[in-house]
Curated annotation (Swiss-Prot):
Transmembrane segments: none
Name of the molecule in the record: UPF0122 protein GK1195
Stored InterPro entries: RNA_pol_sigma_r3/r4-like, UPF0122, UPF0122_fam_protein, WH-like_DNA-bd_sf
The family this protein is said to belong to: Belongs to the UPF0122 family.
Function: Might take part in the signal recognition particle (SRP) pathway. This is inferred from the conservation of its genetic proximity to ftsY/ffh. May be a regulatory protein.
């Protein structure tokens, strides 16, 4: 469950601009603020089932966006490459402060 929550948080971060305000609100409350379905339903004066259905549809949409655009996949790949680069530089060029600063700057872009 934690893995799914983390994935949804990342997908939400990347694709939230493509969601409707209602979808954004439900997802933020459920995944970021850890509200229960019942709490969200009460806040919006809808049924728990309506909230559940909306969240599941939104999750499916986020997965479709990722399948087509691959922003999370590319982000994770960049993170892996940067970690390898940092490791290599620290082993081979540990005393090169300028190179270390450039890699740090690159790392902070994500």
């Amino acid at each position: 469950m934690l893995e799914k929550t983390m994935r949804m948080n990342y997908l939400y971060d990347f694709y939230q601009a493509l969601l409707t305000p209602k979808q954004r609100n439900y997802m933020a409350l459920y995944y970021l603020d850890d509200y229960s379905l019942g709490e969200i339903a009460e806040q919006y004066e809808v049924s728990r089932q309506a909230v559940y259905d909306n969240i599941r549809r939104t999750e499916a949409m986020l997965e479709q966006y990722e399948e087509k655009l691959g922003l999370l996949r590319k982000y994770e790949r960049r993170r892996q490459i940067i970690e390898r680069l940092k490791d290599y530089i620290s082993r081979r060029y540990g005393a090169d402060a300028e190179l270390a600063a450039l890699v740090r700057e690159l790392d902070e872009l994500d």
